């Protein structure tokens, strides 16, 4: 049966678990890794836990993983408490099992016209929803959503539903840009911008950062709205302005990598074109938390689309190239999800129900290539992302224990084999 461990009662804290879950339970009871200091976005009593080492205006959506001798915690560092606005990607590290932590390190900074501390301000691109995994070679991978300036899914009417974000050029899917007349441009491997006839325009762009140039002249950022103001900002400044060519407004999948247990990080790299299909629409997003490195060395990351269907992508070369699951374009699950691997090799996916109730479950028997619907497990939770890990044939899942996002608990279940198939033994929590 499931056993329930109280984690954080009557709070709206995000809940995170690592493979050293008992260590993290103790640590989390004594230390707060990230804590907002703005009472507009967090209960004033909780902001008193914020200090110079862990504080910021607002934090949401954490991910925690062990890499070598280090614990790495990643999170959205926000200008407000919304799913949009100026959102950086931040981490902290611990090399003593969570007793002490490094200062906050910003590893991805979005371009912005404005960085106001208000949920009414969305004059910025943003990162959101990190998901970490450890590649077989030891590299730490973070997959995260990136949006050009907009409100993401919360204002779908301004997303570019009719603009293709990638075009086939030299046998490879390359990013596109559009001018105000709707003409498209393609960015080649070297960053040169080609027009719709694939002729070099003389413009170059660092696609992930978005900085566009004509020769040495700075033209603005392809991920921002607007055009050059009278008081021109310098390239690389905290705020800048929109370029005359713009990337389509939609979600993108950016990958960051660390080869030294989280001390230093690569620049974000767009991998969306490797796994996107037309049916996904304007949103193919990361299911935040942690990915899975299977017994066979395959790295799997959980995604989902706006219709709340799930997708898994995988890499067999330490995260260099990514592939979409085979067969049906969507996995048999719902919304944001997480996965664990049983000793039998089966992979169990736990989804996010549309309302309070049993947790939808899917299972893969071929290392994440295909998935089958496994019904619902008797793990009751509201509409909220879970965190789930496995140790042997035991499964530990953190989730709210209420019809709202409160009363966080960790429930413990067990995988078992029935008629040659793996299942999760999950009767109603006691």
Regions found by a protein language model. Give the residues of each.
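Asp-box/BNR beta-propeller blade signature and adjacent active/binding-site loops
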Residues: 3-10, 21-430
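Polybasic, low-complexity RNA-engagement segments
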Residues: 17
């Amino acid at each position: 049966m499931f056993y329930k461990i109280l984690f954080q009662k009557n709070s709206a804290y995000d809940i995170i678990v690592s493979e050293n879950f008992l260590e993290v339970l103790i640590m989390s009871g004594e230390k707060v890794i990230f804590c907002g200091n703005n009472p507009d976005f967090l209960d004033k009593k909780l902001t008193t836990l914020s200090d110079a080492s862990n504080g910021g205006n607002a934090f949401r959506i954490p991910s925690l993983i062990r890499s070598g001798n280090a614990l790495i915690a990643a999170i959205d560092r926000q200008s407000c408490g919304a799913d949009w606005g100026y959102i950086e990607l931040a981490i902290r590290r611990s090399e003593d099992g969570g007793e002490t932590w490094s200062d906050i390190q910003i590893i991805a900074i979005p371009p912005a016209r404005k960085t106001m501390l208000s949920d009414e301000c969305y004059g910025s691109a943003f990162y959101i929803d990190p998901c970490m995994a450890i590649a077989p070679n030891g590299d730490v991978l973070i997959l995260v959503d990136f949006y050009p300036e907009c409100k993401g899914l919360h204002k779908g009417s301004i997303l570019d539903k009719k603009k293709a974000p990638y075009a086939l050029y030299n046998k490879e899917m390359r990013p596109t840009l559009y001018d105000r007349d709707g003409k498209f441009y393609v960015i080649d491997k070297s960053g040169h911008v080609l027009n719709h006839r694939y002729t070099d325009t003389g413009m170059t762009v660092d696609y992930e950062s978005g900085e566009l140039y004509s020769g040495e002249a700075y033209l603005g950022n392809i991920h921002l709205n607007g055009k050059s103001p009278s008081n021109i900002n310098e390239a690389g400044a905290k705020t800048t302005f929109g370029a005359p060519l713009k990337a389509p407004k939609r979600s993108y999948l950016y990958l960051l990598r660390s080869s030294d247990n989280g001390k230093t990080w690569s620049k974000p790299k767009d991998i969306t074109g490797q796994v996107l299909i037309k049916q996904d629409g304007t949103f193919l997003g990361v299911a935040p938390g942690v990915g899975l490195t299977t017994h066979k060395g395959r790295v799997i990351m959980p995604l989902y689309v706006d219709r709340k269907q799930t997708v898994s992508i995988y890499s067999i070369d330490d995260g260099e190239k990514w592939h979409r699951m085979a067969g049906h374009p969507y996995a048999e699950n719902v919304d944001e999800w997480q996965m664990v691997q049983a000793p039998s090799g089966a992979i169990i996916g736990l989804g996010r129900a549309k309302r309070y109730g049993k947790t939808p479950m899917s299972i893969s028997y071929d290392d994440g290539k295909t998935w089958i619907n496994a019904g619902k497990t008797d793990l009751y939770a509201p509409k909220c992302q879970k965190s789930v890990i496995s140790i042997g044939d035991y499964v530990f899942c953190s989730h709210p224990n209420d019809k709202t996002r409160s009363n966080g608990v960790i429930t413990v279940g067990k995988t078992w084999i029935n008629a040659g198939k793996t299942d999760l033994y999950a009767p109603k929590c006691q």
